[in-house]
Amino acid sequence: MQLNVNDAQAIEVSELTFGGEFNETLVHQAVVAYMAGGRQGSKQQKTRSDVSGGGKRPWRQKGTGRARAGTIRSPIWRGGGTTFAARPQDHSQKLNKKMYRAAMRSILAELVRTDRLVVVQDFAVETPKTKDLLGKLNNMSLTDVLIVSDAVDQNLYLAARNLPHVDVRDVQGSDPVSLIAYDKVLITVSAVKKFEELLG
């Protein structure tokens, strides 16, 4: 299939990578798995046995007229433990490589279909100045954009770092969440070829 390039003639790309059907279920699974993998999972609270103290019972079992109490660290007491305390856990979800690649292909195909993929021959800035990059993006009418190249250019990365709705990634650093999070994805021809290699 043909893919239009902004500043050059159209290029021939793989139908498998850029022309497949959109599998919403698979993309959803990939996005959820990716975001779950980013969770720290280190939350921890103390149960009645974790709270320091409370070894000796506050008063005897019988004869006081008060409700029986075995420890001052009971969850119903002030200063006691938490009833269902949070424990550290691994939130990561298993996603086969084959499924991940299929989800990425599905996202790229949908970006092409909805005219959200802007292909350019090359994209770089001479100096690491935000003003220069902003001027370039304004000329292309891009405000909310992910810039993907085959390798991250240091000047480009530094220039984009302070822009709120602009991100720069290389092909290896692209993920399902970043690809669908922006209005447009600006991608270089070399990055397109790299995606074909990795996902083909």
Curated annotation (Swiss-Prot):
One Pfam family it belongs to: Ribosomal_L4
Molecular function in Gene Ontology: rRNA binding; structural constituent of ribosome
Disordered, as annotated region: 38-72
Keyword RNA-binding belongs to the record: yes
Keywords, comma-separated and alphabetical: Ribonucleoprotein, Ribosomal protein, RNA-binding, rRNA-binding
GO BP term, example: translation
Family annotation (NCBIfam families): rplD_bact
Record-given protein name: Large ribosomal subunit protein uL4
Originating species: Pseudomonas fluorescens (strain ATCC BAA-477 / NRRL B-23932 / Pf-5)
Gene behind this protein: rplD
